[in-house]
Amino acid sequence: MSSSAIQVAKTATYLPDLVEVQRASFKWFLDLGLIEELESFSPITDYTGKLELHFIGSEYRLKRPRHDVEEAKRRDATFASQMYVTCRLVNKETGEIKEQEVFIGELPLMTERGTFIINGAERVIVNQIVRSPGVYFKDEMDKNGRRTYNASVIPNRGAWLKFETDKNSLLHVRVDKTRKINAHVLMRAMGLSDNDVLDKLRHPEFYKKSIDAANDEGISSEDQALLELYKKLRPGEPPSVSGGQQLLQTRFFDPKRYDLGRVGRYKINKKLRLTIPDTVRTLTHEDVLSTLDYLINLELDVGGASLDDIDHLGNRRVRSVGELLQNQVRVGLNRLERIIKERMTVGETDSLTPAQLVNPKPLVAAIKEFFGSSQLSQFMDQTNPLAELTHKRRISALGPGGLTRERAGFAVRDIHPSHYGRLCPIETPEGPNAGLINSLATHARVNEYGFIETPFWKVENGVVIKDGDPIYLSADREDEVRVAPGDVATESDGRIKADLIPVRYRQDFEKVPPEQVDYVALSPVQVISVAASLIPFLEHDDANRALMGSNMQRQAVPLLRPERALVGTGLETQVARDSGMVPISRVNGTVIFVDATAIVVQDEDGQEHTHYLQKYQRSNQDTCLNHRPIVRCGDQVIVGQVMADGSACEGGEIALGQNVLIAYMPWEGYNFEDALLVSERLVTDDLYTSVHIEKYEIEARQTKLGPEEITREIPNVAEESLGNLDEMGIIRVGAFVESGDILVGKVTPKGESDQPPEEKLLRAIFGEKARDVRDNSLRVPGTERGRVVDVRIYTREQGDELPPGANMVVRVYVAQRRKIQVGDKMAGRHGNKGIISRILPREDMPYLPDGTPVDICLNPLGVPSRMNVGQVFELLMGWAASNLDSRVRIVPFDEMHGAEMSQETCEAFLKEAAKQPGKAWVYNPDDPGKLVLRDGRTGQPFDQPVAVGYSHFLKLVHLVDDKIHARSTGPYSLVTQQPLGGKAQQGGQRLGEMEVWALEAYGAAYTLQELLTVKSDDMQGRNEALNAIVKGKPIPRPGTPESFKVLMRELQSLGLDIAVYTDEGKEVDLMQDVNPRRSTPSRPTYESLGVADYDED
């Protein structure tokens, strides 16, 4: 297929750098965030005030990391840099100053791709969206149906302050959800006189009631107010004025305990129209009085006061890596401060140095904990480039300081008008996290305060002005202007065509003439996320199916021979480039050397730059990372040019699947309920073959009986099983291994008790020690097979860090090619997913008039009810494109070029294709888009014409090889003694309550008895049954299930006298000791029954 791409609709602009949100935030942390934290703790003074330790934060430095990124991955190390900071110790008494550079810990560094390498694994820190600090006004209904108002002042850290009104028009205040206090008590405690307060209020008469109430309670002075405050906040402790003073001071006016943050100060100033400088991060009297004033205006419904919508994006902000890390550093420094103070007090004042005071451990621990186990530090999804990119742009409302799944209501999850151009309304998970985890829209960016902004073009007098950079607006700012959507039609000079334009204004829609429009959106794509923007004809799909389509593209497995989509949206190149999976030229220059492992570029100054390529590396999801060069020697390259294809890329574009010939028709019921019927061509031509790399690991440990040994000499193993092992007993690279083959030979010393009696006898007679080791080798597990692509040996001698107790670690990487097979899951880009139900020989598949057999038959009933008609447009456009030998790029929302544009474009392309020589049959005007197909088995035409065309289909990561599983015997749960569940635990299939009902309905008594006893938790019965099966004897009668015994014990523990009796009324002792080696069977088994007993039964 030629690579000439026809661009049908123009993209408005190139997208901005898609990983910017991660990189910019980490850069801010290194430039400002870390310094800010270090300096906020300086100086640290000891309890006597003699010594002071100053951190000179602006002079911190980072050492070059010990390992580079690749080395860190290989050694399971962390890609981190050591932090040093200059400390100054001042002795106040002698005036002596000691200055020293001190090591304060290791800081993991971000790689170029926006990820972190922690213990050899690539991780991503997900952005968190939280409620912005500031002041919020809400209304609530009380029990009597009267509306009351309240105001909450929410800091970045510290105590919440909540003012509320009640039915008697009194003002109350709560600190951190404690008991109500009269608001005027707080005012007096803060040292404000009645007149100070009344002068600041626009409606003082409303407040006078609260003053009277305070006087009635006998609180007329500052001291009384402080005592009252202390009583309410610290009930049960003896109150004192100084205690109250201290409490108030630390709760709200101490920068260490109370911090509004830059954002909180900015929001409060904006809401209450104050002009307090943003260096003042604590509460001020002015804040409190203005809040009261605003609340009273709300209560009286005057002065333009308005309530806040907490789900509005102007009131939610994004915390990215930098800020999350800064919070964690603060936790570490808090611990460090305590240690330093203790050491100052304990140590000898004269001989102390800064290095003795500063212990790096608490800071290291805090940072390690954040990267290793925080909810927001996630193992990177590396299935394909799109998955990686989307993961870095994810925005989660969960995590520390955020919401929890259980508490999040419907309003938080819902789409809000302020999401436009900021958060994608489509891409979110299905299930309990729906709406809590979102994706950043394509053009969105995060501003310095953490609010999401989106770009617009300015409109003046009905003309769109597109020179210069677009203007970014935050959600608050956007509400105040009239914004037209991105698909308004304009003349060539930028003048808006229509007489009335639909605009959004204050979260409502209205129609206005072009002169009143203030801004117009940049592009129709700016509303959606990167994954959704890769779906062609997105506007014809129902939103639920588009959601599945964008989620399933992230699960596409990189194929052996990827192929670009025939019908795309034009954003594929940038997605591939920004994902970080493809190598990009760092300089302008000429390629002077290319091979499979490296590309060398010579720049204009004659310097050589080597770009190394990855070969068959294992990704986090066991898919294969591999680079294939696409430049040749002598090619000119420019900065940012893609030089090699990564996995799931072709020609520098993302290529997640294959373009296959699809027919929408039923075939013998094999595509009932979303099943797929596919042709054998997909298997034989390796269209959907993917490479998967598994990692197997074994450690040789030090045991009590001596060290384990990695060796070729394994007891009781035939020589042919060792054919592929080297002299150390490790498999050679390139060997093909199947289930049960030895990868690494290992023997473990055996203790006395492990030895069978005949061994002991031999040793007693001959006195010589038989080689007492047992085979503990690493073998290929159950269903796996493949080729060994890499072996890595780690020992302490080489300087590798090993887990405690291990002498040697060996890792073997096995690659397998997986062809497509029955049970694999496939999907299109429009949420049309299905499982392969049958693979037909190509001669039996329906075929086209020119004899081409179809690749996949889809059920036509999958389209109407699901309303994802985009797949039909893609099908027809792909059919036209393949017959024109070209590729088509269509930007979503093309209706801006005219009504019914998609349909007209498809039809025009089909007519064009039919004009090609010998292609007249491609388009039938009586049945546009359909062809008469013939049955491959009989050669007879089908009754109805069928819609046929090329569609981009993906193979998803849910492969049947990884799911299929069977259990004969295996591990049991410790508590219930029932088999475990799941493939990883070698578990069984659960027969739950409803399955038991189904069997009861059929009266399958013996099946039921087995299910509830020997196949489950009758411990003795199952051992006897196994024994009987192995020896070929009849299976004995089942006994009592363990869970029944538990039930009996539970009922007895309630004080009920419950027991089990035989027919004769004899009590059965359920708790008798079960000893399988007893000579007399505990109950009749088939062996112990006489012939006479059989007859009676």
Curated annotation (Swiss-Prot):
UniProt-annotated stretches for the region Disordered: 1072-1097
A GO-annotated cellular component: DNA-directed RNA polymerase complex
EC number: 2.7.7.6
Biological process, per Gene Ontology: DNA-templated transcription
Secretion signal, residue range per the UniProt entry: none
MF annotations from Gene Ontology: DNA binding; DNA-directed RNA polymerase activity; ribonucleoside binding
Protein keywords: DNA-directed RNA polymerase, Nucleotidyltransferase, Transcription, Transferase
CDD domains: RNA_pol_B_RPB2
InterPro entries: DNA-dir_RNA_pol_bsu_ext_1_sf, DNA-dir_RNA_pol_bsu_external_1, DNA-dir_RNA_pol_su2, DNA-dir_RNAP_su2_dom, DNA-dir_RNAP_su2_hyb_sf, RNA_pol_bsu_bac, RNA_pol_bsu_CS, RNA_pol_bsu_protrusion
EC class (word): transferase
Catalytic activity from the UniProt record: RNA(n) + a ribonucleoside 5'-triphosphate = RNA(n+1) + diphosphate
Function description: DNA-dependent RNA polymerase catalyzes the transcription of DNA into RNA using the four ribonucleoside triphosphates as substrates.
Family (UniProt): Belongs to the RNA polymerase beta chain family.
Complex formation: In cyanobacteria the RNAP catalytic core is composed of 2 alpha, 1 beta, 1 beta', 1 gamma and 1 omega subunit. When a sigma factor is associated with the core the holoenzyme is formed, which can initiate transcription.
HAMAP family in UniProt: RNApol_bact_RpoB (MF_01321)
PANTHER family xrefs: DNA-DIRECTED RNA POLYMERASE I SUBUNIT 2
Protein name: DNA-directed RNA polymerase subunit beta
Biological source species: Parasynechococcus marenigrum (strain WH8102)
